């Protein structure tokens, strides 16, 4: 499952996130809770792509995305379900909007609210940090 999730993050990055990096129009950016709480079309599209693909990897799991939570707060009630994926499609949205390199895509998997695994894909570095509970962290790059 480690490689599959990393592959999904890479695919979302290559097709939905990086084509918009340094190429956003004003219409591609919106605010959520305040003028500094930004969301972009890349955030929304990547989350829409990732959610069903992650759920398909683990039967009965539920994907809880940052953007869906900001629009439908009641889905937070599912955070303690048996298997829950959490998705932040573009962490560091302000940096993404500014065109700087300091942003990433993050996914985690929790079992009854306890984190089990986490993935941080850095599109500008083309690598993925993968953490597993009680087993440490590995770095996968597109080169290996």
Across the structure, where does each feature detected by a protein language model lie?
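DPxDG-like acidic metal-binding loop motif
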Residues: 75-138
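Short, intrinsically disordered, charge-balanced linker/junction segments flanking boundaries
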Residues: 141-144
């Amino acid at each position: 499952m480690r490689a599959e999730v990393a592959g999904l993050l890479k695919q979302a990055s290559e097709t939905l996130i990086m084509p918009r990096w340094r190429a956003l129009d004003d219409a591609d950016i919106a605010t959520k809770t305040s003028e500094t709480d930004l969301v972009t079309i890349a955030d929304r599209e990547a989350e829409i792509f990732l959610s069903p693909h992650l759920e398909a990897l683990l039967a009965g799991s539920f994907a809880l995305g940052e953007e869906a939570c900001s629009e439908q707060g009641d889905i937070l009630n599912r955070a303690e379900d048996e298997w829950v994926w959490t998705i932040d499609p573009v962490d560091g949205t302000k940096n993404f909007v500014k065109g700087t390199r300091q942003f990433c895509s993050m996914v985690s998997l929790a079992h009854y609210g306890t984190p089990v695994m986490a993935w941080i894909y850095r599109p500008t570095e083309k690598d993925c940090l993968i953490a597993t509970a009680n087993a440490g962290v590995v770095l996968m790059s597109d080169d290996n």
